[in-house]
Regions:
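Short helix-to-turn junction characteristic of helix-turn-helix DNA-binding domains
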Residues: 101, 157-160, 208-209
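N-terminal hydrophobic signal/anchor transmembrane helix of membrane proteins
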Residues: 3, 111-113, 246
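Basic/polar phosphate-binding segments, predominantly the helix-turn-helix DNA-binding elements
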Residues: 158, 164-202, 219-248
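Residue at a beta-strand N-cap/secondary-structure junction
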Residues: 21, 164, 212-213
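Generic protein-terminus/edge-of-domain signal
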Residues: 1-32, 36, 49-51, 69-78, ...
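Short, Lys/Arg-enriched, Trp-marked, Pro/Gly-tolerant hinge/linker segments that flank
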Residues: 79-90, 105-116, 124-155, 159, ...
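A hydrophobic/aromatic-rich effector-binding and dimerization subdomain
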Residues: 38-107, 124-136
């Protein structure tokens, strides 16, 4: 599972085979073959790929988004486009573009990069004309303000995850009540504060399994105090115990 994150690129995930769970702020989408997930600019999102899943991931940089509008940061497209067998459906046309891009990427013939770029613009055209969403300026400004505060909190967690952080620490960082902080964090990340903190710790722990330090030392280093709960979540995410993962990657 990828950690919740954000970027200025427009990100699209097209599922070729298998299943995937996608999270965008407080929305959850269960994707299957032919479905498309779209993470809008600067919105917090993450995905969980199930075993055996194949997918295409495309990130479209701001330079291309500016061709749609100078105010590209406010662009919002439909996040989830479900696969449809109906002739001429949006999902079918977008899927054909992704398959074409995949073919061109693998062929790597002369001029294929230009053809690939033309497919990106064809995709953007379909999104702009058939999947664009409009939000009121007042609501958008409020969302942007709150979203920036939550991003600052996530960066704070990344910097201090090894410490014994609590919900009260997160609320104090934003100078709000714990109740308001809970609602705000859940709204923009789709996770609880403690759930996200646990994921950050688990990710750093997993990365260090390739080293030689004892597992008990890694647990302590990354602020993990309840091993029983951690082990359950680790097996849910990676399908194995830390010891099994270490043997596999050693």
């Amino acid at each position: 599972m990828l950690l919740a994150h954000w970027h200025e690129h427009l990100e699209l995930v097209y599922v070729l085979e298998g299943e995937m769970t996608a999270y965008s702020q407080d929305s959850v989408y269960e994707l299957v073959s032919g479905d498309l997930f779209l993470a809008n600019t600067s919105e917090i999102h993450y995905t969980h790929t199930h075993r055996g899943t194949r997918y295409c991931l495309l990130q479209i940089p701001p330079a291309h988004l500016k061709r749609i509008t100078p105010d590209w940061k406010t662009l919002r497209f439909q996040e989830y486009i479900m696969h449809s067998e109906e002739s001429g459906s949006l999902s079918g046309r977008l899927g054909a573009i992704f398959r074409s891009m995949l073919f061109l990427q693998e062929r790597k013939g002369q001029g294929d990069q230009l053809l690939l770029l033309s497919e990106v613009f064809r995709l953007l055209y379909l999104l702009d004309t058939e999947a664009r969403e409009e939000k009121s300026s007042g609501r958008l400004e409020e969302n942007v303000r709150d979203l920036e505060r939550i991003k600052q909190t996530m960066e704070y967690i990344q910097d201090h995850y090894q410490e014994p952080l609590t919900l009260s620490d997160g609320a104090a960082f934003l100078s709000v009540t714990p109740e308001h902080f809970c609602r705000l964090f859940k709204k923009y990340t789709g996770q609880t504060f403690l759930g996200y903190l646990g994921q950050v710790r688990m990710t750093h722990f997993y990365e260090d399994l390739s080293g030689e330090d004892k597992i008990t030392l890694l647990l302590d280093r990354h602020g993990i105090r309840n091993y029983k709960v951690f082990l359950r979540e680790f097996k849910k995410n990676y399908g194995q115990t830390p010891q099994q993962v270490r043997r596999k990657i050693s």
